A protein has these predicted regions:
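Hydrophobic, aromatic-enriched alpha-helical segments typical of multi-pass transmembrane helices
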Residues: 1-190
């Protein structure tokens, strides 16, 4: 079976999305015997029991996911650019490009930031045996990074979702039925 480079790139983007989900699960999953308590906004007590390999694997999933996500989005942009040539459509293709480029970079950063907050909390606690102080340090690191987190959410999730919804509902994408448009609308980042 001969699969085109375009299809391979789109599949790579889907695999990247799956790696994000796996990385997020490794980061967020809490066992039955682990505490779900939080200290401050970002620190969970469960990070202390989380194996370091899970944190490292989550970071690797985020890095690989970002690269593959970019490949898929770049291919989608090339397809949109090729098929949408009217001036009104071009505006949305450019907005799609801006959203996926900035959003992909931001989400790679955000994933690493979340993991680093967990690692800072865990290793500060191990070193100094003071949970409150470790949580305070980790939360301060998060607060310093809150603005880029908000920017990444606005650029990647909100802007990309708006652009995709316009492309879907203004019938710029070749979706034949309302059911297909609804399903495509549900596959947005938000």
């Amino acid at each position: 079976m001969n699969v085109s480079k375009e299809k391979k790139a789109i599949v790579a983007g889907m695999v990247g999305c799956l790696l994000y989900v796996i990385g997020d699960f490794l980061f967020a999953a809490i066992g039955k015997n682990q505490s779900a308590d939080s200290i401050g906004l970002m620190v969970k007590v469960a990070y202390l029991d989380m194996a370091t390999w899970r944190m490292v694997l989550s970071i690797i999933c985020g890095v690989l996911g970002t690269a593959l996500y970019y490949i898929g989005f770049h291919q989608m942009w090339k397809l949109l650019k090729r098929h949408l040539s009217q001036p009104k459509q071009r505006k949305w293709v450019k907005m799609f490009q801006a959203a996926y480029l900035t959003g992909t970079v931001c989400w790679g950063y955000v994933h690493a930031m979340f993991m680093n907050v967990a690692l800072i909390f865990k290793f500060t606690f191990v070193q100094y045996d003071d949970m409150r102080a470790a949580a305070e340090i980790a939360n301060k690191v998060f607060y310093c990074n809150a603005a880029p987190l908000l920017a990444s959410y606005i650029l990647c999730d909100v802007l990309l979702s708006i652009v995709m919804l316009v492309l879907i509902w203004e019938r710029m994408l070749p979706l034949k039925s309302t059911g297909q448009r609804i399903l495509a609308s549900l596959c947005n980042p938000i």
